[in-house]
């Protein structure tokens, strides 16, 4: 059953929330040591939450619209009384003293927090190999990376260790692992979801979002976490839609979708074959297909990383070892140190105008071109990641690693929503279809993904 069917089953007393938690705990007990997905699991707390929900249902009391659904949370999102390490030695003794806004919203709707998932150290990576706790295995492609930086969250869903997981997406960190693990991942419009309680990698790019095995889980999670937050300055005012309303859609009649030639050109041929078949399903469902060009694709990666380096350097200055943990430069991994050192260099007064300000100008060009493209179409569709996940332990240069991000950083630079859903497989390895829309058209992506699932 899909996530919303399970929710209905719990609310209709066909299964209990406690049974749901126990089923996931059993899988974690059997597989987590091998897969290294959850860094911390609080079985007692999760079972206690579940029993309270079951009691309310038995007594005919009102329950939330996530009642009994189980969540895994990325290790850079604050959850009270859990170790929130961002998978770094720097924070290995930092206990969350409060809940991030998204956690409070999940709990308010009777969602159950089961534990904390692995990730790339400080979200700086695309493979979940840089974690100080060791790499996470890909349940859908054994021996290969799950993607990153939210690799533990994607793997938790793929391994059926939770119903829904939360991740953060700076340049594809939800969509990249969703593609590699064959699950659904969603990066909302920038500002649609509060970032209060997130350990930032890059303030102007980061966004919290959900991962699940089907679109109904994404829609339910968005209904809970997408809202204005007066404590977080980047959240947007305005009423959010009911994302579950799109799950009833059966057709894409009247929707125009665009394929970008440049996205195809940078993607491996066998991935394009799988993605093209998926796009054809959208056309069969009634969508009109057009081809567009994106002139600024070569600007995207250098622009993204220049901004990322500077904002990451600024964000990590608070990890100086005085209040908790260690000084970050003394204990961090190679990729985190690289970003700090480059960010420090670019941030110097004599270089800021030469690099950072030009990156901001390039970002404006990218945003303007994407938004102009989306004025004439409803959605942009194409590959999520241009190449297959490498084998764990393979040595890649930094530029080879960054190449995973070329198609996903665009949404972060432009602030637009984007989702990834399994398009198919190449030699048994999942590949994703990425769907992007203009700002605040998140619902259109949910609709397209739901119709695609029904077509399959």
From Swiss-Prot:
Q: Can you provide one Gene Ontology molecular function annotated for this UniProt record?
A: ATP binding
Answer whether the UniProt record assigns the keyword Protein biosynthesis to this protein. yes
Alphabetized, the UniProt keywords read: ATP-binding, Ligase, Nucleotide-binding, Protein biosynthesis
Q: State the oligomer form and interacting partners.
A: Heterotrimer of A, B and C subunits.
Q: Which NCBIfam families has this protein been placed in? A: gatA
Q: Which family, according to the similarity comment?
A: Belongs to the amidase family. GatA subfamily.
Q: What is this protein called?
A: Glutamyl-tRNA(Gln) amidotransferase subunit A
**Gene symbol?**
gatA
């Amino acid at each position: 059953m899909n996530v919303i069917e399970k929710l209905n089953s719990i609310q209709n007393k066909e299964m209990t929330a406690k049974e749901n938690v126990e089923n996931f705990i059993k899988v974690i007990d059997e597989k987590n040591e091998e897969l290294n997905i959850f860094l911390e699991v609080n079985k007692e707390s999760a079972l206690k939450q579940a029993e309270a929900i079951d009691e309310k249902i038995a007594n005919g009391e009102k329950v939330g619209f996530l009642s009994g659904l189980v969540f895994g949370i990325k290790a850079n999102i604050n959850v009270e009384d859990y170790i929130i390490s961002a998978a770094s030695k720097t924070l290995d003794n930092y206990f969350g003293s409060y809940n991030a806004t998204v956690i409070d919203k999940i709990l308010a709707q009777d969602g159950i927090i089961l534990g904390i998932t692995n990730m790339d150290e400080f979200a700086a990576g695309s493979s979940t190999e840089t974690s100080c706790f060791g790499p996470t295995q890909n349940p859908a492609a054994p021996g290969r990376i799950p993607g990153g930086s939210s690799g533990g969250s994607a793997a938790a869903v793929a391994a059926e260790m939770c119903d829904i997981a939360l991740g953060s997406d700076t340049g594809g960190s939800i969509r990249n692992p969703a593609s590699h693990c064959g699950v659904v991942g969603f990066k909302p419009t920038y500002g649609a979801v509060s970032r209060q309680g997130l350990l930032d990698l890059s303030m102007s790019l980061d966004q919290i979002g959900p991962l699940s095995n089907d679109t109904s889980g994404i829609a339910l999670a968005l209904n809970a976490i997408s809202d204005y937050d007066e404590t977080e300055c980047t959240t947007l005012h305005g009423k959010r839609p009911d994302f579950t309303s799109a799950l009833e859609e059966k057709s894409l009649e009247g929707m125009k979708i665009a394929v970008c030639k440049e996205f195809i050109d940078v993607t491996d041929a066998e991935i394009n074959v799988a993605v093209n078949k998926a796009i054809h399903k959208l056309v069969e469902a009634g969508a009109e297909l057009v081809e567009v060009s994106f002139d600024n694709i070569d600007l995207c990666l250098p622009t993204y990383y220049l901004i990322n380096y500077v904002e990451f350097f600024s964000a990590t200055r608070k990890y100086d070892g005085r209040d908790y943990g260690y000084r970050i430069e003394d204990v961090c991994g190679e990729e985190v140190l690289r970003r700090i050192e480059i960010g420090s260099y670019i941030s110097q007064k004599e270089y800021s105008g030469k690099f950072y300000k030009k990156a901001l100008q390039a970002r404006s060009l990218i945003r303007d071109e994407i938004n102009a493209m989306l004025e004439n179409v409803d959605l942009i569709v194409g590959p999520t990641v241009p190449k297959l996940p490498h084998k764990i332990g393979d040595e890649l240069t930094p530029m080879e690693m960054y190449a995973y991000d070329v198609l996903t950083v665009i949404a972060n630079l432009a602030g637009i929503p984007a989702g990834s859903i399994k398009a198919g497989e190449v030699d048994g390895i999942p590949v994703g279809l990425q769907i992007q829309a203009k700002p605040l058209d998140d619902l259109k992506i949910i609709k397209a993904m739901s119709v695609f699932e029904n077509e399959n």
